[in-house]
Amino acid sequence: IHLTGSGEPMALLGVRVAAPFFEVMGVAPAVGRTFSAEEDTAGRGAVVILSDRLWRSRFAAGADVVGRTVRLNNQPVQVVGVMPPSFTFPPGNAGATPDLWLPIADNIERYVGRHYLFVVGRVKPGVTMAQAQADLTGVATALAVRYPNDSGGHGVHVVPLHAHMVKAVRPSLMLLLGAVGCLLLIGCSNV
C-alpha cells in the first residue's frame, strides 16, 4: 500500500480486517475509533486506522489526524483511529508489524477463491475447541456450497493462536529448552 499526498510517498504494510477485529483482540484505539459495521460493507469502507508508529512518524502524533483524508494507492480514505503503541498483530511479529488497517469488506469479492486469509476469533467461555471446530466446519461447508468452484477442498482448522504462532519455531524452542536443561544439570552436578 502506498501513502501519498503529504510528504514523500511511503510504501506501507496494510492489513484488511473485519469491523469486530479490534474488539475480538481486546484492544481499543488510543485516538479515535475502530471501524463501524456500516464501514464494513462493500463500497463504504473508505476509512483507515493507523499504527502508533505511522501516526508518530508521518503525522507528528497530532490528534487532528482523525477525520483527515489521506491517499492510499491514490484513493482518498479517511483516518478514523490510531492504535496504541502496545498493539501489534500478530503478536511478537516485529519484522512485519502493520502500519495501518483497512476494512476487508470493502474489497471482499477480490478474496473469493484465494486461500491465504488468516481468520482469528475468540472462543466464548465454556465452548471447547472441538465445539468451535464443529461450528466452523459447518460454516466452511456452507461456503463450499455457495462457492463450489472456489472451495478447493480446503477446510477450517481451529487452533489456539499461541500454538499457531510458535508452530514454526517449536522444534527449535524444544531443542533450546533441552540444551538449557542439560547445562543446568551439569552446573548443578559440579557444585
Question: What do the predicted segments below correspond to?
Answer:
Residues A11-A37, A46-P171:
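Mid-to-C-terminal secondary-structure elements
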Residues I1-H2, P84:
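Generic short beta-strand segments
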Residues V169-V191:
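Hydrophobic alpha-helical transmembrane segments of multi-pass inner-membrane transport and secretion
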Residues A37-G43, L183:
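Glycine-rich loop motifs involved in handling phospho/adenylate chemistry
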Residues L3-G7, R33-T34:
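A short gly/proline-enriched turn/hairpin at secondary-structure junctions
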